[in-house]
Amino acid sequence: MIIDVNTPISSRLDKYLKRLYPLLTQGVIEKALRQKQITVNSQKAEASLRVKGGDKIFINDKFNLPVKQPEKLVFTDAEIKLAKKITTDYLIYEDDNLIAINKPAGLATQGGSKINLSIDSALKYLNYKGADFKLVHRLDKETSGLLLIAKNYLSNVKLHDAFKEKLVVKTYFAVTYGKPIKNVGEVRSNIEKSKGSTPKITDIYSENGKLAITYYKLLKSLDNNLFLIEFTPVTGRMHQLRLHAKLLGCPIVGDDKYGNKEIMPYSKYMFLHANNICLSEKIFGKEINLEAKLPFYFTDKFVEC
């Protein structure tokens, strides 16, 4: 029996086989590989070998494959189109461990009760086709910019640990209405999030909420009391930058949750963009510095870059 690998993204051989035959156990796969009952491109292979489109998996006719096939999942045309964009149009970096994309504003990272299309749902389609993508972190739906996606389980674990250990530095650009009193500074607050409610600032000494820390720097004065500010979050609380911008007295333009009526004329988009991510060499053995191009509404209306 010959299986033509048709995944657009490389996948571990054992994981690829398990998707095709869910009843196959790891032990059975590894034994079959040792005995050359399963080979790849007519060569002996390890379970960790990454297979990709064009590879051929040879399975000895005497090997008893479980007959149960995986559940047939149904994906929408929109999810399939988005999956293609993730691996082409939105893609700005790829290696063996991760991909980085420039997420457009208006596209949700994860699904929800009122969300029919998301990055996560498109990744499920790619995974169904043999990839092993896992979301590492999230961006708000109306926030654009850099989003990291792990390509396998081990990379996902390493990246999650890296975020906890502060080995990942993220910077954001925002256009705000008004500016902070100081051009450079730090914001500290507690942010409380109850189930089903909007996050809110609580007193720094309160037992409610979790500590949130953000560094900021004024980059440029624009017209109409608008300013370009760089934010660097130290912690990763929900809506942290939006809440801290409001706390500084300079809400982000287009923020319909924490903004005000004075900035409504500019509010077709929320002007918050994840511009840069730097991964320490301690994570994958090399420093990775990524930058996502500003969306057109930044460059066309406010910022010359």
UniProtKB/Swiss-Prot annotation:
<feature type="active site">
    <location>
        <position position="140"/>
    </location>
</feature>
<dbReference type="Pfam" id="PF01479">
    <property type="entry name" value="S4"/>
</dbReference>
<dbReference type="InterPro" id="IPR050188">
    <property type="entry name" value="RluA_PseudoU_synthase"/>
</dbReference>
<dbReference type="InterPro" id="IPR006145">
    <property type="entry name" value="PsdUridine_synth_RsuA/RluA"/>
</dbReference>
<dbReference type="GO" id="GO:0160141">
    <property type="term" value="F:23S rRNA pseudouridine(955/2504/2580) synthase activity"/>
</dbReference>
<dbReference type="InterPro" id="IPR002942">
    <property type="entry name" value="S4_RNA-bd"/>
</dbReference>
<feature type="domain" description="S4 RNA-binding">
    <location>
        <begin position="11"/>
        <end position="70"/>
    </location>
</feature>
<keyword id="KW-0694">RNA-binding</keyword>
<comment type="function">
    <text>Responsible for synthesis of pseudouridine from uracil at positions 955, 2504 and 2580 in 23S ribosomal RNA.</text>
</comment>
<dbReference type="InterPro" id="IPR006224">
    <property type="entry name" value="PsdUridine_synth_RluA-like_CS"/>
</dbReference>
<comment type="similarity">
    <text>Belongs to the pseudouridine synthase RluA family.</text>
</comment>
<dbReference type="InterPro" id="IPR020103">
    <property type="entry name" value="PsdUridine_synth_cat_dom_sf"/>
</dbReference>
<protein>
    <recommendedName>
        <fullName>Ribosomal large subunit pseudouridine synthase C</fullName>
        <ecNumber>5.4.99.24</ecNumber>
    </recommendedName>
</protein>
<dbReference type="GO" id="GO:0003723">
    <property type="term" value="F:RNA binding"/>
</dbReference>
<dbReference type="GO" id="GO:0000455">
    <property type="term" value="P:enzyme-directed rRNA pseudouridine synthesis"/>
</dbReference>
<dbReference type="Pfam" id="PF00849">
    <property type="entry name" value="PseudoU_synth_2"/>
</dbReference>
<keyword id="KW-0413">Isomerase</keyword>
<keyword id="KW-0698">rRNA processing</keyword>
<dbReference type="InterPro" id="IPR036986">
    <property type="entry name" value="S4_RNA-bd_sf"/>
</dbReference>
